[in-house]
From Swiss-Prot:
Statement: the UniProt record of this protein carries the keyword Cell membrane: yes
Top-level taxon of origin: Eukaryota
Modified residues (Phosphoserine): S20, S213
PTM entry text: Phosphorylated by BRI1, ASK7/BIN2 and ASK9/BIL2.
Residues in Protein kinase domain copies: 59-325
Name of this chain's protein: Serine/threonine-protein kinase BSK8
GO CC aspect terms: plasma membrane; plastid
Lipid-acceptor residues (N-myristoyl glycine): G2
Keyword Cell membrane: yes
Length: 487
């Protein structure tokens, strides 16, 4: 039982050797490619989203300003292992749930490979949540303004501009020409490091809220006059995005236009791009940015013409986006630890040995022996259940361990991810994969960044015959472990 090679192992081998290179450019019909592999828009329960985000845990916040942001974005994972991004609006936003649902449904009909698409929403009680595809390779702002090893390459910057222009052209063709507060934080990079436009900007932050949250120096002049966003305002914001790509800085449009008028182009261009582009290409992109930033809205180009202007400028089309951006390819398998290898093989005997040796090192201090000894009589009784479960686990009496750990969990005085992980393995040993999956998911709720929870989910999913989901969970576990124990 413990040493058989699992279907998950076979699947992982195929994914490494049999995956074809992804389409790098996607220059098909101006980026109108529909994403047909996504589920239809749906309404989620608050319980589902709480479970997916580990109770809106701080560790799962991915928005730039963390908990201080007016509308916080969390990462999460559904039961089917699909990774999601959850935008949680301020409680005073969208007081009318019907209006919120109507807007979300309209945006949720869009499906395009140039966008991080909206999968659903939740409007239970006072909550207003948007649920979208999760993009794991961060934002344009991170890669452009806060890079660590090298500045973003010219070819990648051009690819960003094209993909976002294609996304805007698609939205316009579907009757959603308004995009609120387009900026470098709205551009995300998917598993393959291809740039995508966040769907969140297609809805305002509240029913009657502002369309722009950035510094007023970057807002379209007509918005300052009227307070209304128009399709032409979106083009102006695209122009500010082009300035970001040209300069590597978030430079006010008025200052950039002064530099352009004075022909002081060197002051505008990012010095890290030296030698990567011709003067003609640089001039053409500056000219396009200037057109987008025209004071009169009617003088600005439309999205279709932006796409037409960007296509001839593309460089290094044969190089995949992950190489240009300098991030690992989604098809690349992270080197697995002994525990990861054991989970890949569904080698339950090896998993048991590793988890037994680990003990409770990964639990928070509240679950240590010292803490238990300081607690009340009820908690002392709880400790007895845990100790009996640990003894049964050590001696491989897995049915007894399940019974004792269940008593510990039912008391509910505290959450121990290790207890849930151990019980999950006990269920696997007793050929109860559904129960094992539930325990592994509960361990992740308590400790969202714990790799062992993802690994055990992978083993349980494989036992349930859900091989694709198991592969995803295994990759997630390997990624979390590599972050926890960097080389």
């Amino acid at each position: 039982m413990g040493c058989e090679v699992s279907k998950l192992s076979a699947l992982c081998c195929v994914s490494e050797s049999g995956r074809s290179n992804p389409d790098v450019t996607g220059l098909d019909e101006e980026g109108r490619g529909e994403s047909n592999d996504l589920p239809q828009f749906r309404e989620f329960s608050i319980e589902t989203i709480r479970n997916a985000t580990s109770g809106f845990a701080a560790e799962n916040i991915v928005s730039e300003h963390g908990e201080r942001a007016p509308n916080v974005v969390y990462k999460g994972k559904l039961e089917n292992q699909r990774r999601i991004a959850v935008k949680r609006f301020n409680r005073k936003s969208w007081p009318d749930s019907r209006q919120f649902l109507e807007e979300a449904k309209a945006v949720g009909q869009l499906r395009n490979h140039r966008m991080a698409n909206l999968l659903g929403c939740c409007y239970e009680d006072e909550e207003r949540l948007l649920i979208a595809e999760f993009m794991p390779n961060e934002t344009l702002a991170k890669h452009l303004f806060h890079w660590e090893s090298q500045p973003m390459k010219w070819a990648m910057r051009l690819r960003v501009a094209l993909h976002i222009a294609q996304a805007l052209e698609y939205c316009t063709s579907k009757g959603r020409a308004l995009y609120h507060d387009l900026n470098a934080y709205r551009v995300l990079f998917d598993d393959d490091a291809n740039p995508r436009l966040s769907c969140f900007g297609l809805m305002k932050n509240s029913r009657d809220g502002k369309s722009y949250s950035t510094n007023l120096a970057f807002t379209p002049p007509e918005y300052l006059r009227t307070g209304r966003v128009t399709p032409e305002s979106v083009i102006y914001s695209f122009g500010t995005l082009l300035l970001d790509l040209l300069s590597g800085k978030h430079i006010p449009p008025s200052h950039a236009l002064d530099l352009i008028r004075d022909r002081n182009i060197q002051m505008l261009m990012d010095s890290g791009l030296e030698g990567q582009f011709s003067s003609d290409d640089g001039t053409e992109l500056i000219r396009l940015a200037s057109r987008c930033l025209q004071y009169e809205p009617r003088e600005r180009p439309n999205p279709k013409s932006l796409v037409s202007a960007m296509i001839p400028l593309q460089k290094d089309l044969e190089i995949a986006s992950h190489q240009l951006l300098g991030v690992p390819n989604s098809a690349t398998t992270t080197a697995l630890s002994p525990l990861g290898e054991a989970c890949l093989r569904s080698d339950l005997t090896a998993i048991h040995e590793i988890i037994e040796k680990l003990g409770y090192k990964d639990d928070e201090g509240a679950t240590t022996e010292l803490s238990f000894q300081m607690w009340t009589d009820q908690m002392q009784d709880t400790l007895v259940f845990k100790k009996k479960g640990d003894s049964a686990f050590r001696h491989k009496d897995f049915a007894k361990a399940i019974e004792c750990y269940s008593q510990f969990i039912e008391v509910g005085t505290m959450g121990s991810p290790t207890v849930h992980a151990r019980q999950s393995l006990c269920y696997l040993m007793n050929d109860m994969p559904r129960e094992a999956l539930n325990n592994a998911m509960q361990a992740q709720v308590i400790s969202p960044a714990w790799h062992i929870a993802s690994y055990l989910q992978a083993v349980a999913l494989s036992a349930l015959g859900q091989e694709n989901e198991a592969h995803t969970a295994l990759k997630d576990g390997a990624m979390l472990e590599s972050k926890r124990n960097p080389l």
